[in-house]
Design a protein with these regions (language model features):
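Short glycine-enriched nucleophile-adjacent loop
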Residues: 61-67
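Alpha/beta hydrolase fold serine-hydrolase catalytic domain that processes acyl esters and thioesters
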Residues: 1-3, 7-48, 68-224
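Gly/Ala-rich beta-loop-alpha elbow adjacent to hydrolase catalytic centers
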Residues: 52-57, 61
Length: 224
């Protein structure tokens, strides 16, 4: 029996908040709900499921591969990473199962670089130039008009730098500033539907900007 489970990406403000929590908590509510769904599937579906999803869906797919015993293969797209706390808690399981996980990413995608990557294989796909950089996260960007994968490429240098910056926040920013900044940035992405106040969002951006400047001055490969 070939059973495939596909998780959807971020749909609303609550899930944007949950994205942020997944970067500084061991587990988020949506991640736990995804694992509960997998565990409630009929026993006759077996323990060799294939899971997939884009963005938040890709994160959920990776999460259930690690935290349940029912997944044999994970094919994620542009799935974001996990908190330091999660990686410490599940270190040995991640090492044992990471080769079940492939994360297909547009070479300029900026979401897959958020937090800690646990995929055993990350595959970067060449994409057409986008005037609006937010469009590099579109799920169909890595496919041709016929629905085939585009040619493989390499991760863009600027997204490598973005990943290093995110790690700077996760590793060095103390609490409660760390969660405050992450929640505020997610509030900006939510826009007018955000539960974060305009003051909180602006404070978060300014704090994150200060860390960005400090991080940039330490990049000797750019500034000598």
């Amino acid at each position: 029996l070939d059973v495939n489970v596909i998780f959807k990406g971020t749909q609303n403000g609550y899930e944007w908040d949950d994205n942020g929590e997944g970067a500084y908590l061991m587990e988020s509510d949506c991640q736990r709900a995804a694992a509960d769904y997998i565990n409630r599937l009929p026993k006759e579906y077996g323990n060799h499921l294939t899971v997939s999803g884009h963005s938040k869906g890709g994160n959920k797919a990776q999460y259930v591969t690690i935290t349940t015993n029912r997944v044999a293969r994970c094919v994620a797209e542009d799935g974001q990473g996990f908190s330091n706390e999660f990686c410490r808690q599940y270190h040995f399981v991640i090492e044992d199962r990471k080769n079940r996980i492939k994360n297909y990413c547009a070479e300029n995608d900026y979401v897959n670089v958020i937090a800690n990557t646990i995929a055993g294989t990350s595959i970067y796909i060449k994409t057409e130039f986008q005037i609006n950089p937010f469009l590099y996260h579109k799920p169909n960007l890595i496919l041709t008009q016929k629905g085939d994968f585009r040619e493989e490429g390499r991760q863009a240098e600027w997204t490598k730098g973005l990943h290093s910056y995110f790690q700077e926040i996760l590793d060095l920013m103390p609490e409660p500033q760390r969660s405050y900044v992450i929640d505020g940035v997610m509030g900006l992405l939510e826009g007018k539907d955000s539960e974060e106040s305009a003051y909180n969002r602006m404070y978060s951006v300014l704090t994150a900007g200060g860390y960005w400047l400090a991080w940039m001055t330490e990049q000797t490969q750019w500034f000598g």
